[in-house]
Amino acid sequence: MSPYCTLHLHNVPAGREAEYAAWFDGPHRKALASLRGLVNADRFEVSPIQIMPDIPQPWRYMSLYEFDLPNAAIDLPALGPLLADARDAGLVADEDESERIYSYRMYSDWKISPNWQRDQPLSGVSIILANYTIGRYAEYQDWYDNVHSGEVINVPGHVGMKRGELSELQIEPRRYCPGDQLVLCAQQTDDLLFTIRDFSARAGGRSPSGIAMQPRSSSGSTARTVHYFNKISGDRFWKGGVAYGGDFAPYKAAQAAAQNK
């Protein structure tokens, strides 16, 4: 068995958003049950809160399909006709050829932190369409596996990460992909702004937690785009609050001190 993820990044014609949502959670989800190796499928909408606000967000929606496939060459392309149903019904706005379907062979399943409440659904996910610096692939993998992944998933509201590499197996339409490395992060937070701000604070050594990330490795190319999405599909949603296995006391103290100034 091999883990894969397929991202369907798309836009929907104005006025047909509810129709697409009903299709995804109705006929489409029913059809997905016939696919071998499908582990999970959910749909997300781009968040107004982004860690890199100047980066364009070309897609309003993303559908995420997670697989554990017995034979990827046979099974992965089977998703294609099911996605084509939405396109054929006019539910995908693609006049600008913005639709993207990217499939990644994942290096592993989720790496999780004590933050993750496994009995609860995610509030959202973020993706990085990433690249490594040429000639430094092994260093890039080591940095993510042994340093940066742990730093990220322990930020309040961030709960897990898994990574992968762009697969040779792709679903039509095959179009330009800006990153051959995928960094997929899971969130459980109803305060994404707090989560993102503390991520940045830890990266800069300014977090009330006292936790500071190591300097970013130059083995990770700056040619990357980051996209945060909120979960919109299914009938179970994050219960509220910010998932964190650590101590919130330093954050509360910092907030109180700021209010007293």
Indicate residue ranges for each PLM-predicted region.
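Macromolecular interaction modules
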Residues: 1-261
